Amino acid sequence: MTMKRALPSPSSLLFFFLLITPLFLCQENRVSASMPPSESETLFKIMESMSSDQQWRQSHPNPCAPGSSWPGIECKTGPDHLSHVSRLDFGSAPNPSCKSSASFPSSIFTLPFLQSVFFFNCFTHFPTTIMFPIKLIPNSSLQQLSLRSNPSLSGQIPPRISSLKSLQILTLSQNRLTGDIPPAIFSLKSLVHLDLSYNKLTGKIPLQLGNLNNLVGLDLSYNSLTGTIPPTISQLGMLQKLDLSSNSLFGRIPEGVEKLRSLSFMALSNNKLKGAFPKGISNLQSLQYFIMDNNPMFVALPVELGFLPKLQELQLENSGYSGVIPESYTKLTNLSSLSLANNRLTGEIPSGFESLPHVFHLNLSRNLLIGVVPFDSSFLRRLGKNLDLSGNRGLCLNPEDEFSVVKTGVDVCGKNVSSGGGLSVHSSKKKSQASRYYRSCFFANALFPFALFLGLHQRWVL
């Protein structure tokens, strides 16, 4: 008698399928977690030149494998279904620290899928320079290159940096870079943020600056740049932040600056700029912070600055301004801080300042102002030590406020009670502590949408 072979039931087939599927998935994960040998060898060499962990190669033979990833390294699966390094971060916790003998690894520019590099406080003991390998990979995918606070990173910015055509964020701040800014940088049409601040760069700002049509943030502050502000700056229509402070720039602010309609922050302090402001400066309707202390301007204060409705901070100290304080400044309803100290301003203080709801800092000291201080006791108490009118011999205080004010830098009208120092208001409550950290407010409020716009890493810094 022939026995018929029993067919597996549908339920047993389903069980078998569910049993073997995870095995295939695990095999798929193992494949996707592997890295091309040449790329893994490059990564090992980078880690050996940078990391203080000398056992890194043995401890992480496959750094992209699930469960084996290391802080500071991110991997992505490429179109070849293999894993590739997409991000390298060194120097700031929880990322790996750098060893004292670390030197700049030029081989990072040979990683074909690398999108972001961040080296913070890595090169601190031995001099090193930004180097490029002889042979570069075509069509580099690098979008962010940030080298910050590296006191031993010196030398010139290499023109070959212009080969990184996908670069959107270039931050080389707080290093010891020297020489001219290479014009080749301004061929990087994808750049949205360029920060070369706090170096020792010299020479002029290249005219090619105007090629960066997508630029949103530009910071060249704290260098030794000379020459004039290039007129091509007017072509940066998307610019939101401009910081050229603490250089040796001279001449006038170019007329074309009025075309920067998206500008929120402009700092030009500590230069040699002089002459009249552009008449069209009132077109900067998005401007919130204008910092321009310590320039030999020697002109009257521009009335047009009073027509900037979003202006929150205006600093024009120590610049030789003369004439009266424009009445238009009392119409700046969003103004929180105004400093016109150490100029040659004359006339009376406009009375409208006390009606500005957000003002908490007002410095008109060391001028030639005259007349009765036009502020009532409530305004004096509100500003407290954030109000400085000292050094104006022609000013006097209303006698009605004599008993609410102590240690004043302004005489009471008709009396001689000057005791020197700034204006200080008596109050039974504890005096509020002054805070002048205005720029942080700008980055938190004005540049947060900009950070979202970039769509890259949240680590980059304006």
UniProtKB/Swiss-Prot annotation:
Which windows of the sequence hold LRR repeats?
139-164, 165-188, 190-212, 213-236, 238-260, 261-284, 286-308, 309-331, 332-355, 357-381
Compartments it resides in: Cell membrane
Reply yes or no: does the keyword Phosphoprotein apply. Answer: no
The regions listed as transmembrane in this protein's record are 442-462
Extracellular-side stretches of the chain, per the record, are 27-441
Q: Which domain of life is it from?
A: Eukaryota
Glycosylated residues, chain numbering: N139, N334, N363, N416
Q: Where is the signal peptide?
A: 1-26
Provide one Gene Ontology cellular component. plasma membrane
Q: Which SUPFAM superfamilies does this chain map to? A: L domain-like (SSF52058)
> Is Cell membrane given among the entry's keywords?
yes
Where is it mostly found?
Answer: membrane
> How does this protein lie in the membrane?
Single-pass type I membrane protein
Return the similarity comment.
Answer: Belongs to the RLP family.
- Recorded protein name is Receptor like protein 29
* Organism expressing this protein natively: Arabidopsis thaliana
